[in-house]
Amino acid sequence: MEFILSLVGSLLLIICVLVSVAFLTLLERKVLGYIQIRKGPNKVGLMGIPQPFCDAIKLFTKEQTYPLLSNYLSYYISPIFSLFLSLFVWMCMPFFVKLYSFNLGGLFFLCCTSLGVYTVMVAGWSSNSNYALLGGLRAVAQTISYEVSLALIGFKILLFSFL
Protein backbone atom coordinates (compact mmCIF):
# COMPACT_ATOMS: atom_id res chain seq x y z
CA MET A 1 0.00 0.00 0.00
CA GLU A 2 2.87 2.35 0.81
CA PHE A 3 4.44 1.66 -2.58
CA ILE A 4 1.20 2.56 -4.38
CA LEU A 5 0.88 5.78 -2.38
CA SER A 6 4.46 6.79 -3.17
CA LEU A 7 3.92 5.93 -6.84
CA VAL A 8 0.75 8.04 -6.99
CA GLY A 9 2.53 10.85 -5.13
CA SER A 10 5.47 10.83 -7.52
CA LEU A 11 3.15 10.75 -10.54
CA LEU A 12 1.23 13.70 -9.11
CA LEU A 13 4.52 15.52 -8.49
CA ILE A 14 5.64 15.00 -12.10
CA ILE A 15 2.30 16.20 -13.47
CA CYS A 16 2.39 19.28 -11.24
CA VAL A 17 5.96 20.09 -12.31
CA LEU A 18 5.09 19.81 -16.00
CA VAL A 19 1.94 21.94 -15.65
CA SER A 20 3.80 24.55 -13.61
CA VAL A 21 6.49 24.79 -16.29
CA ALA A 22 3.76 25.31 -18.88
CA PHE A 23 2.26 28.15 -16.87
CA LEU A 24 5.69 29.67 -16.23
CA THR A 25 6.16 29.90 -19.99
CA LEU A 26 2.76 31.60 -20.17
CA LEU A 27 3.94 34.08 -17.52
CA GLU A 28 7.13 34.67 -19.49
CA ARG A 29 5.16 35.35 -22.66
CA LYS A 30 2.84 37.72 -20.79
CA VAL A 31 5.76 39.66 -19.29
CA LEU A 32 7.51 39.89 -22.65
CA GLY A 33 4.24 41.11 -24.16
CA TYR A 34 3.88 43.86 -21.58
CA ILE A 35 7.52 44.86 -22.05
CA GLN A 36 6.82 45.28 -25.78
CA ILE A 37 3.63 47.28 -25.01
CA ARG A 38 1.17 44.61 -26.11
CA LYS A 39 -1.07 42.19 -24.25
CA GLY A 40 0.70 38.90 -24.86
CA PRO A 41 -1.26 35.68 -25.41
CA ASN A 42 -4.86 36.55 -24.55
CA LYS A 43 -6.93 35.20 -27.44
CA VAL A 44 -7.64 31.73 -26.04
CA GLY A 45 -10.16 31.53 -23.21
CA LEU A 46 -10.20 33.89 -20.26
CA MET A 47 -7.02 36.03 -20.28
CA GLY A 48 -5.14 33.34 -22.23
CA ILE A 49 -5.06 30.84 -19.36
CA PRO A 50 -5.72 27.75 -21.59
CA GLN A 51 -2.86 28.84 -23.89
CA PRO A 52 -0.29 26.32 -22.50
CA PHE A 53 -2.68 23.44 -23.19
CA CYS A 54 -3.23 24.69 -26.74
CA ASP A 55 0.55 24.93 -27.18
CA ALA A 56 0.91 21.33 -25.95
CA ILE A 57 -1.73 20.10 -28.42
CA LYS A 58 0.03 21.98 -31.22
CA LEU A 59 3.38 20.52 -30.20
CA PHE A 60 2.13 16.94 -30.18
CA THR A 61 0.34 17.25 -33.53
CA LYS A 62 3.32 18.66 -35.43
CA GLU A 63 5.07 16.62 -38.08
CA GLN A 64 8.09 14.73 -36.79
CA THR A 65 11.18 15.48 -38.85
CA TYR A 66 14.63 14.00 -38.49
CA PRO A 67 17.91 14.25 -40.39
CA LEU A 68 18.11 11.83 -43.29
CA LEU A 69 21.33 10.09 -42.26
CA SER A 70 20.73 10.09 -38.51
CA ASN A 71 20.45 7.15 -36.15
CA TYR A 72 16.70 7.39 -35.75
CA LEU A 73 16.20 5.60 -32.44
CA SER A 74 18.96 7.28 -30.45
CA TYR A 75 18.12 10.65 -32.03
CA TYR A 76 14.63 10.53 -30.47
CA ILE A 77 15.38 8.60 -27.28
CA SER A 78 18.10 10.93 -25.95
CA PRO A 79 15.86 14.01 -25.35
CA ILE A 80 13.19 11.79 -23.78
CA PHE A 81 15.80 10.26 -21.47
CA SER A 82 17.01 13.76 -20.59
CA LEU A 83 13.45 14.75 -19.64
CA PHE A 84 13.10 11.67 -17.44
CA LEU A 85 16.40 12.43 -15.71
CA SER A 86 15.36 16.00 -14.96
CA LEU A 87 12.06 14.73 -13.56
CA PHE A 88 13.86 12.14 -11.40
CA VAL A 89 15.81 14.95 -9.73
CA TRP A 90 12.52 16.15 -8.24
CA MET A 91 12.17 12.84 -6.39
CA CYS A 92 15.03 13.57 -4.01
CA MET A 93 13.84 17.06 -3.09
CA PRO A 94 12.75 17.32 0.54
CA PHE A 95 9.03 18.09 0.63
CA PHE A 96 6.63 18.39 3.55
CA VAL A 97 5.22 14.97 2.67
CA LYS A 98 8.11 12.58 2.03
CA LEU A 99 7.67 10.64 -1.19
CA TYR A 100 10.88 8.65 -0.99
CA SER A 101 13.33 8.34 1.85
CA PHE A 102 16.84 8.81 0.50
CA ASN A 103 19.82 8.36 2.74
CA LEU A 104 22.07 9.50 -0.09
CA GLY A 105 19.81 12.05 -1.78
CA GLY A 106 22.70 14.38 -2.60
CA LEU A 107 24.56 11.60 -4.37
CA PHE A 108 21.39 10.70 -6.30
CA PHE A 109 21.07 14.36 -7.33
CA LEU A 110 24.66 14.45 -8.59
CA CYS A 111 24.21 11.17 -10.47
CA CYS A 112 21.02 12.32 -12.19
CA THR A 113 22.49 15.66 -13.20
CA SER A 114 25.72 14.10 -14.45
CA LEU A 115 23.86 11.51 -16.55
CA GLY A 116 22.36 14.38 -18.53
CA VAL A 117 25.78 14.83 -20.14
CA TYR A 118 25.45 11.54 -21.97
CA THR A 119 22.10 12.49 -23.50
CA VAL A 120 23.62 15.61 -25.05
CA MET A 121 26.57 13.61 -26.37
CA VAL A 122 24.34 10.87 -27.83
CA ALA A 123 22.05 13.46 -29.43
CA GLY A 124 25.00 15.17 -31.11
CA TRP A 125 26.51 11.89 -32.24
CA SER A 126 23.29 10.35 -33.53
CA SER A 127 22.54 13.20 -35.92
CA ASN A 128 25.62 12.20 -37.99
CA SER A 129 26.56 15.84 -38.46
CA ASN A 130 30.03 17.05 -37.60
CA TYR A 131 28.73 20.41 -36.40
CA ALA A 132 26.17 18.83 -34.09
CA LEU A 133 28.83 16.48 -32.75
CA LEU A 134 31.20 19.37 -32.04
CA GLY A 135 28.40 21.32 -30.36
CA GLY A 136 27.49 18.29 -28.27
CA LEU A 137 31.10 17.75 -27.20
CA ARG A 138 31.40 21.44 -26.31
CA ALA A 139 28.25 21.20 -24.18
CA VAL A 140 29.61 18.06 -22.51
CA ALA A 141 32.87 19.81 -21.62
CA GLN A 142 31.00 22.79 -20.18
CA THR A 143 28.62 20.63 -18.18
CA ILE A 144 31.39 18.51 -16.71
CA SER A 145 33.37 21.59 -15.68
CA TYR A 146 30.30 23.09 -13.99
CA GLU A 147 29.49 19.81 -12.24
CA VAL A 148 32.87 19.75 -10.53
CA SER A 149 32.27 23.15 -8.96
CA LEU A 150 28.67 22.19 -8.08
CA ALA A 151 29.88 19.04 -6.33
CA LEU A 152 32.54 20.96 -4.41
CA ILE A 153 30.01 23.57 -3.27
CA GLY A 154 27.56 20.84 -2.26
CA PHE A 155 30.19 18.94 -0.29
CA LYS A 156 31.30 22.14 1.42
CA ILE A 157 27.71 22.86 2.50
CA LEU A 158 27.34 19.27 3.67
CA LEU A 159 30.62 19.41 5.57
CA PHE A 160 29.81 22.67 7.37
CA SER A 161 26.28 21.57 8.23
CA PHE A 162 27.68 18.99 10.66
CA LEU A 163 29.94 21.45 12.50
Curated annotation (Swiss-Prot):
Catalysed transformations (reactions): a ubiquinone + NADH + 5 H(+)(in) = a ubiquinol + NAD(+) + 4 H(+)(out)
Q: Which GO terms describe its cellular component?
A: mitochondrial inner membrane
| Membrane topology summary | Multi-pass membrane protein
Question: GO biological process: what's one of them?
Answer: aerobic respiration
What Pfam families does its record include?
NADHdh (PF00146)
User: A GO molecular function for this record?
Assistant: NADH dehydrogenase (ubiquinone) activity
Question: Which InterPro entries does the UniProt record give?
Answer: NADH_UbQ_OxRdtase_su1/FPO, NADH_UbQ_OxRdtase_su1_CS
Query: Which branch of life, at top level?
Result: Eukaryota
List the PANTHER family hit by this protein, alphabetically.
NADH DEHYDROGENASE SUBUNIT 1, NADH-UBIQUINONE OXIDOREDUCTASE CHAIN 1
The Swiss-Prot or TrEMBL record describes its family as follows:
Belongs to the complex I subunit 1 family.
Q: What is this protein called?
A: NADH-ubiquinone oxidoreductase chain 1
Q: What is the lineage of its organism?
A: Eukaryota, Metazoa, Ecdysozoa, Arthropoda, Hexapoda
